[in-house]
């Protein structure tokens, strides 16, 4: 008897037909299927009115990046619903793994009692080398990760339920191991990143001498990171 498929929900926090929307979903799907070819992957866009999935039917719930500014006091219903959903799923009896990417990390941090702020560097675009904490080094079996970045908002307070796996809250994990988040974009490559870059100015794409970032066509660890994500989220390797 075959084992059940690896069940994944992608919560898209952007309009799917906006620039880069469907290519981003396609890239996440591709990265998952490199490790789990038979994965059952469904996309839910609360921003377009979709109902968020029953967590008991999922092994992994992925919150994508998105354009809505979570520092705003007034939040649309879909954002409020997403934050409440995160509180419910992390407190409930079913424990699917939850992955947050960029906006997804920020939403998870807010839902779990953390706080956000703006980067004093402005919009950060490029590829960064992220030093890991001892816990992060053990989890990823590496002292650092190289990852795409494209954000201005960041987590300033991780709250009571999250632990840092990298310096500057770049990677977080919940104390119970259910939640893993990245401020960067492990799903991005240079083609996808270029869709979200508004200018060819080399500073904006990581080539500026003072940026500390590499250009978006530099090598990165996206595939390695996603392989580790899938292994972490898979029921048969949930403790590895």
UniProtKB/Swiss-Prot annotation:
It comes from Gibberella zeae (strain ATCC MYA-4620 / CBS 123657 / FGSC 9075 / NRRL 31084 / PH-1). It is an enzyme of class 3 (hydrolase). The keyword Ribonucleoprotein does not apply. PANTHER family: GLUTAMINE AMIDOTRANSFERASE YLR126C-RELATED (PTHR42695:SF5). It comes from the Eukaryota. GO terms for molecular function: hydrolase activity. Its EC number is 3.-.-.-. Signal peptide: none annotated. Pathway: Pigment biosynthesis. Keywords: Glutamine amidotransferase, Hydrolase. Pfam families: GATase. Residues 13-205 form the Glutamine amidotransferase type-1 domain. Glutamine amidotransferase-like protein; part of the gene cluster that mediates the biosynthesis of the yellow pigment chrysogine. Pyruvic acid and anthranilic acid are likely substrates for the nonribosomal peptide synthetase chry1/NRPS14, with pyruvic acid adenylated by the first A domain and anthranilic acid by the second. If pyruvic acid and anthranilic acid are merged and released from chry1/NRPS14 by hydrolysis, a subsequent amidation would lead to 2-pyruvoylaminobenzamide. This process is probably catalyzed by the amidotransferase chry2 using glutamine as amino donor. Belongs to the peptidase C26 family. This is Glutamine amidotransferase-like protein chry6. The gene is chry6. InterPro entries: ChyE-like (IPR044992), Class_I_gatase-like (IPR029062), GATASE (IPR017926). The active site is at 102 (nucleophile), 185, 187. One of its GO terms (cellular component) is nucleus.
């Amino acid at each position: 008897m075959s084992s059940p498929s690896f069940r994944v929900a992608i919560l898209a926090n952007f309009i799917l037909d906006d620039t880069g929307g469907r290519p981003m979903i396609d890239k996440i799907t591709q990265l998952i299927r490199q490790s789990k070819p038979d994965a059952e992957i469904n996309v839910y866009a609360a921003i377009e009115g979709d109902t968020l999935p029953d967590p008991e039917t999922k092994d992994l719930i992925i919150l994508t990046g998105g354009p809505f500014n979570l520092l705003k006091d007034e939040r649309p219903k879909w954002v409020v619903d997403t934050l409440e959903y995160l509180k419910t799923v992390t407190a409930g009896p079913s424990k699917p793994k939850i992955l947050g990417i960029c906006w997804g990390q920020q939403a998870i941090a807010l839902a779990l009692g953390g706080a956000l702020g703006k980067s004093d560097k402005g919009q950060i675009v490029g590829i960064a080398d992220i030093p890991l904490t001892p816990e992060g080094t053990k989890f990823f079996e590496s002292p650092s990760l190289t990852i795409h970045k494209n954000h201005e908002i960041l987590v300033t307070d991780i709250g009571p339920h999250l632990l840092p796996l990298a310096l500057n809250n770049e990677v977080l994990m919940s104390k119970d191991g259910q939640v893993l988040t990245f401020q960067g974009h492990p799903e991005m490559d240079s083609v996808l990143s270029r869709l979200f870059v508004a200018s060819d100015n080399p500073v904006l794409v990581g080539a500026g001498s003072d940026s500390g970032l590499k250009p978006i066509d530099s090598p990165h660890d996206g595939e390695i990171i996603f392989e580790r994500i899938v292994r972490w989220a898979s029921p048969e390797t949930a403790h590895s």
